[in-house]
Curated annotation (Swiss-Prot):
Keyword Lyase among UniProt keywords: no
Organism whose genome encodes this protein: Alcanivorax borkumensis (strain ATCC 700651 / DSM 11573 / NCIMB 13689 / SK2)
Catalytic activity: (2E)-4-hydroxy-3-methylbut-2-enyl diphosphate + oxidized [flavodoxin] + H2O + 2 H(+) = 2-C-methyl-D-erythritol 2,4-cyclic diphosphate + reduced [flavodoxin]
Gene expressing this chain: ispG
Entries under Gene3D superfamilies matching the protein: Dihydropteroate synthase-like, Sulfite Reductase Hemoprotein, domain 1
Listed EC numbers: 1.17.7.3
Protein name: 4-hydroxy-3-methylbut-2-en-1-yl diphosphate synthase (flavodoxin)
């Protein structure tokens, strides 16, 4: 078997967003953002709980008004995931939401205003022990930088970030992370590469306004994947014009593809052709939906014929090779038993869940053994 490639990550300071470490040697965390009206407490709480079910590490909530800041406090009491307050324009909202149990304040250098306002936010964050994210966006750069560069560029994004990092540094505040997002993949890549060589703070990766589910997934996978392979990035958010739960799924899939996080069922499936002995696409789609609740790492291969099936099945936890008259199942790389086409989904689900149960039992035994 090909040896697993280990990505050497850039060493950064570590900050804590609630109970989730970001930076240092911490696992790369996956974030998402609610798209409900924050003042609709029930809707926002419901969405956050769905994100938690999907495995999200950190959730950002827009706080556009004092009313939203008050609603944030009610939301905070009903969920137990770290929450970031997304603040634009009015620094006083940041001060207000800091009293409501927030875990991190995101400010936008392009619209937060004068240095005295930033100083007030810094002092508040110090008093409350909160980290700050300097969130630079190509679409909302400071007017001065817009005039200087004429249009958004990677240099403009980096200059904005470094200016505000310098402000935080002058007020002896190091508990922050930074993002420099653009909707253009190349601008995003260049900005993060330049910034990573000039700051020791953790970097929050993302392609802003990436697009629809399909196009946004592609852009994010290309940009974030390239940066992560270079060891750049400590937390990610995949921005999609879609259900926020999809952002979490795509985020984890990006990390899983690079062996940076192990979570959930990794389905390996052929694209299918006329050699398939069962409906591969229908089978894997149904399996993916049924196995969404699993957080343990399990590799499942579903291959429609004998060309590549045995080779793939021998490398995974649970495998299936299409055959005539019946399909052959593999368990831990060894041939196990035959399955008819009608029983494929039920039997593969049973095998995966049995594997998960065994993993949990082995982990429990290990914990008991270590405690003795």
């Amino acid at each position: 078997m090909e040896p697993e490639v280990k990505i050497e990550r850039r060493k950064t300071r570590q900050v804590m967003v609630g109970n989730v470490p970001v930076g240092g040697d911490a696992p790369i965390s996956v974030q998402s953002m609610t798209n409900s009206e924050t003042c609709d407490v029930d809707a926002t709480v419901g969405q956050i709980r769905r994100l938690q079910d999907a495995g999200v590490d950190i959730v950002r909530v827009s706080v556009p008004s004092m009313e939203a800041a008050e609603a944030f406090g009610k939301i905070r009491k009903q969920v137990d995931v770290p929450l970031v307050a997304d603040i634009h324009y009015d620094y006083k909202i940041a001060l207000a939401v800091a009293e409501q149990g927030v875990d991190c304040l995101r400010i936008n250098p392009g619209n937060i205003g004068r240095e005295d306002r930033i100083k007030a936010v810094i002092q508040c964050a110090k008093d409350k022990g909160l980290p700050i994210r300097i969130g630079v966006n190509a679409g909302s750069l400071e007017k001065e930088l817009q005039r200087k560069y004429g249009e958004p560029t990677s240099d403009a994004l980096v200059e904005s970030a470094l200016r505000h990092a310098d402000i935080l540094d002058r007020y002896d505040f190091q508990n922050f992370k930074v993002s420099v997002k653009a909707s253009n993949v190349f601008m995003t890549l260049q900005a993060y590469r330049k910034l990573s060589s000039q700051l020791e703070q953790p970097l929050h990766l993302g392609v802003t306004e990436a697009g629809t589910f399909r196009s946004g997934t592609v852009k994010s996978a290309v940009a974030l994947g390239a940066l992560l392979m270079e060891g750049i990035g400590d937390t990610i958010r995949v921005s999609l014009a879609a259900d926020p739960v999809e952002e979490v799924r795509v985020g984890f899939d990006i990390l899983k593809s690079l062996n940076l996080r192990k979570k959930g069922v990794n389905i390996i499936a052929c694209p299918s052709c006329s050699r398939q002995n069962f409906d591969v696409i229908k089978t894997v789609n149904e399996l993916e939906a049924r196995l969404e609740d699993i957080n343990e790492s399990v590799d499942l291969a579903v291959i429609g014929c004998l060309v590549n099936g045995p080779g793939e099945a021998r490398e995974v936890d649970v495998g299936l090779t299409g055959g005539t008259p019946n399909n052959l199942a593999y368990r831990d790389g060894e041939k196990s038993h035959h399955i008819t086409a009608d029983d494929l989904v039920d039997e593969l689900e049973r095998m995966v869940r049995a594997k998960v149960k065994k993993q949990r039992e082995d982990e429990e035994k290990g914990i008991i053994a270590r405690s003795e």
